Amino acid sequence: MMSLAKMYDKEYFEGKTYKEGYKFEIFYPFHKTIAEAIFEMFKPRIVLDVRMCYGISC
C-alpha cells in the first residue's frame, strides 16, 4: 500500500500539466486539519508539520 505522502508526491511531481499538479494544493488544507485533530487527540511531544512530509519549505 502506497503511503499518502508518496501518493500525493506522485500526483504533484509526475503531473504533466499545471492542473494535475495543482491537486496537491487543493487537498493540503484537508490534511492540515487532520494533522491538527491528531495532535489534539494524542498530544505528541514532537509534531511533524504536514509540509515536511511533502518537502515543502515554509
Curated annotation (Swiss-Prot):
It comes from the Archaea. This is Uncharacterized protein AF_0605.
